[in-house]
Amino acid sequence: MANLSYWLLALFVATWTDVGLCKKRPKPGGWNTGGSRYPGQGSPGGNRYPPQGGGTWGQPHGGGWGQPHGGGWGQPHGGGWGQPHGGGWGQGGGTHNQWNKPSKPKTNMKHVAGAAAAGAVVGGLGGYMLGSAMSRPMLHFGNDWEDRYYRENMNRYPNQVYYRPVDQYNNQNNFVHDCVNITIKQHTVTTTTKGENFTETDVKMMERVVEQMCVTQYQKESQAYYDGRRSSAVLFSSPPVILLISFLIFLIVG
């Protein structure tokens, strides 16, 4: 982590230095660079520009023959035929009042970001996510008949659970309770629409199976959540990152 921070700092300083050098480089062209002269001064070929206006001979203000202000034939102010002030047909002054030209649709970045973030969330379930597939646990229910029934029907029970992020719950029990309820409800509704019904024994066994999987899901998500927080704390407490942040603040304030 420290090596990565040093590399990030070095890359930022190098980029900032290059940008600073680019800003100091003189731009090509400009006045008196050898390619043009002030009006009235001799050009390299010995000719002189007209004494005023910058147009060609007989052009008082830079237009063509008979162009008082830089337009075409019969153009008082630089527009086209029938254009009083530089617009097109029916255009009084430029880009306004164009012929019902539709504006280009603008992309809503919030919609784009929302669509990208919705990949991990199950649509229509109010923010619930679907966990990865798990192996169904081997459970014992206290008698041989139920144990045999479970082994024969375990493939009909869920092997994935629905859950919310762990930071929305105060403890494991609340997470597991919510996880079990939504998972069984969704699995029951989905299976019933396919023409298959569950008995009371099925529901009892599903509750045991899903509870075990929800506990496993909570442990996995909780570990990932705390690992992420710890990594962020270590990153922002490293000396190179602190130095980089201080340098950025100095540039912004200065």
Curated annotation (Swiss-Prot):
Per UniProt, the keywords (alphabetical) are:
Amyloid, Cell membrane, Copper, Disulfide bond, Glycoprotein, Golgi apparatus, GPI-anchor, Lipoprotein, Membrane, Metal-binding, Prion, Repeat, Signal, Zinc
5 X 8 AA tandem repeats of P-H-G-G-G-W-G-Q: annotated segments:
51-91
Q: Which family does it belong to?
A: Belongs to the prion family.
- Where are the sequence-type repeats located? 51-59, 60-67, 68-75, 76-83, 84-91
Where is Cu(2+) 4 bound in this sequence? 85-87
Entry comment, domain topic = The normal, monomeric form has a mainly alpha-helical structure. The disease-associated, protease-resistant form forms amyloid fibrils containing a cross-beta spine, formed by a steric zipper of superposed beta-strands. Disease mutations may favor intermolecular contacts via short beta strands, and may thereby trigger oligomerization. Contains an N-terminal region composed of octamer repeats. At low copper concentrations, the sidechains of His residues from three or four repeats contribute to the binding of a single copper ion. Alternatively, a copper ion can be bound by interaction with the sidechain and backbone amide nitrogen of a single His residue. The observed copper binding stoichiometry suggests that two repeat regions cooperate to stabilize the binding of a single copper ion. At higher copper concentrations, each octamer can bind one copper ion by interactions with the His sidechain and Gly backbone atoms.
- Identify where the record puts lipid attachment of type GPI-anchor amidated serine: 231
What's this protein's function? Its primary physiological function is unclear. Has cytoprotective activity against internal or environmental stresses. May play a role in neuronal development and synaptic plasticity. May be required for neuronal myelin sheath maintenance. May play a role in iron uptake and iron homeostasis. Soluble oligomers are toxic to cultured neuroblastoma cells and induce apoptosis (in vitro). Association with GPC1 (via its heparan sulfate chains) targets PRNP to lipid rafts. Also provides Cu(2+) or Zn(2+) for the ascorbate-mediated GPC1 deaminase degradation of its heparan sulfate side chains.
Q: Which residues form the signal peptide?
A: 1-22
Identify the taxonomic lineage of the organism of origin.
Answer: Eukaryota, Metazoa, Chordata, Craniata, Vertebrata
Source superkingdom? Eukaryota
Q: Where does Cu(2+) 1 bind?
A: 61-63
- Its source organism is Cricetulus griseus (Chinese hamster)
| Segments of this protein annotated with the region Disordered | 25-104
Q: What name has this protein been given in UniProt?
A: Major prion protein
A GO cellular component term found in this entry reads: cytosol
Give positions of region: Interaction with GRB2, ERI3 and SYN1. 23-231
Q: Which disease is it linked to?
A: PrP is found in high quantity in the brain of humans and animals infected with the degenerative neurological diseases kuru, Creutzfeldt-Jakob disease (CJD), Gerstmann-Straussler syndrome (GSS), scrapie, bovine spongiform encephalopathy (BSE), transmissible mink encephalopathy (TME), etc.
